[in-house]
């Protein structure tokens, strides 16, 4: 009887610990993205960017990229805080580092000057079709629409981020996309990137 109670308590504590770890990852991932949405790029990168990624693309360069993307006069770009679909913790540490995969969806809106400032309806429609095709090829056919009312492309993206932590408290995040696999392999374990193949 004591053995059964011990096993039940041990199982319960393992499940509770795993759930709390997932909650920490979710909260920190949402905080990271909230900082990006608020355009506090420097703080987002200081707190949550993977050090290995910043060796390839320094923080200052990333801040410039974010600034350019969000302040480009030829387009208005906005992101919403993502919706976390699932967090999968990697079962064992790799070189004393804990890993998890965060699967999420995120909506973004893009207003392009080429569409808004088109000289006539024909040019506007041509530009809409051009950009719509480009967005659909990148994000998938059913994930992009053009909203005539506000002249914006509305995009729903589905992505994966890799979370890593040395001690399980402070997590760092790297958005992992298929076209970046070779770069990501430079600082993330290959087995973590299997979902991108």
What are these regions (language model features)?
Residues 1-24:
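Bacterial Sec-dependent N-terminal signal peptides
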Residues 3, 36-43:
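Short, compositionally biased low-complexity segments
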Residues 20, 54-64, 118, 126-130:
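Short low-complexity stretches enriched in small and charged residues
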Residues 21-39:
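Short, aromatic-enriched amphipathic alpha-helices that serve as compact interaction elements
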Residues 26, 42-99, 103-104, 110-112:
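Short solvent-exposed beta->alpha transition segments
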Residues 28, 65, 131-134:
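Charge-rich, solvent-exposed alpha-helical interaction surfaces
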Residues 33-36, 66-73, 135, 163:
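Hydrophobic, Leu/Ile/Phe/Ala-enriched alpha-helical segments that form helix-helix packing faces
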Residues 91-197:
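Exposed beta-sheet edge and beta->alpha loop/turn motif
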